[in-house]
């Protein structure tokens, strides 16, 4: 990593606007970088210099203190680097802007490059962006503010991106994903992106807020608000009136344009005062055998004062989209389904304005009002214990770092808490670790992260603790968290636990203990990756948060036992997270051929996981679940004497006998549930099963022949008559039954042609 020559050390900064204490590996206003936070001098090169430094040491956080930073050209955020500023919520009562980016760039009709270009496992957090050259009297076009590059030029731009806590005061274009063009490669051939996280993005955009296409694995979008009010409120920046801004956006702007995006959920999206609220457009990916189009679900979509609410041009064949517990109010049309196939399903959704097109289904069942906000988790004592600088750890993947890490953990515990910091690197650990009360074991990553094919980086622990065990479920976890303790911003992998390395049987893995156990109340596991983990996370305490857990789990992803108020958000299990890794090229002697990105290795993983892997299991617990996705697993949910609410979860390519839910004496609510293949639900014992909004492709006990391939069907097994089922036995065709909901009154297709002319 070059620590001896280049490492200047990390430090805690005085800023409580982030979800946890900010540990900065570089501060742009420091002398060696030289950014001006008064907004006078050009800070572009200073910020680039800080990013380059942090990228050189393997990844980490570049901090921009509160102030104004003038930027005059595009900035690339490198792999495993996060830009963090001081976030000021624009819905607050003051006109404070926190870290304000003055985007003093030249107007251009070109959409790219973006002001900030994000590479894999990078992030931009806590910035407010203002374009000083933009006026309503002379509206000028600018490229997108954020560019999610995708793999058009390099695999390094393909996977995992975060834009969070960001305000756009007067952007012309907001965020684009997979719009980057490589002139030597056809559009749609290799420019897909994966794992885009957009959270808490607010602002006024004049042309388009989100323009996202060609997503090949799941991300999620939450708390996105586009409204004229944000520019109008910026009176210190010479803002126009809200009526003037609204007059422009309502005649020219589209808040969300979404194309061939797979499986992603959308929570709490609010659009006010635009020409079009949400436009589902044709995708770009070249995939002739099985063309990809939009499929996903919205929960609490709120569209107000628009000309067009939801307009759909293309949907995935046989599938469609879900809109649940929402409001769509528009002058000319609330919903337009112009897709040649696929359906729009509205559940508990209030509309105002005409509907046009076929296959729009309305279900009036009152869906549950579910919690979608991440609970605030404990902030620890602001004392830093750097295992490299203070304890002599050598993170090269070969030196044993166990003693240094545990000594730092013990010191933090004795002193009443603190942050044990593992800078970017590879830490070999050979014994179990205990994280005491109020202590955070922290890697260098401040956002969701995963290994990128072609380049590994960030903080990774190599676990050499367990071999095969018959008592793996009850053995002591590799990392045990106390009360108010956390694991944050790192990845843990098992070099010896992959299918191709163990014995002669290519489908055998070591049964190991849980990687992490939250044993104390108010614990958290956030922005963590687990590669080739047999058992992932166990929760045996109250008020625990698990968020952005990305990995490959052979047996169990998350098990919640005798716990109350556990929150689980954005958990993914997919063998690609293990096989699309740069570790095999960096450590050729430590990792076997299963870590290579090869189709045969990948499907050996899937052959195992599709009959073994269980995602979320709860026993005697209450759990709120959001955005769980798996590919080739055996079971999504299991509940025994528990209460589970699950919102926006999906399962792709499950085997025929796979289960979405096994429920015994439990109360379960599923909202916007997507699945491909498998049986749906087994419910036994006194309890309830409430299902609002569901898409299913291929009946579980039938072969995936063309007779059923494009049919949206359901296969529900309910053993207890007390179980309450909404949406069972559906089949999308005319006439539909009462449980699915009634088709909307249909206008002739010629009316759609006329109405769509207004979108041009």
Model-derived regions, located:
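Well-ordered, non-transmembrane segments within structured domains
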Residues: 46-60, 163, 171, 198-200, ...
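Feature marks extracellular polysaccharide-active and adherence modules
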Residues: 65, 72, 78, 84-86, ...
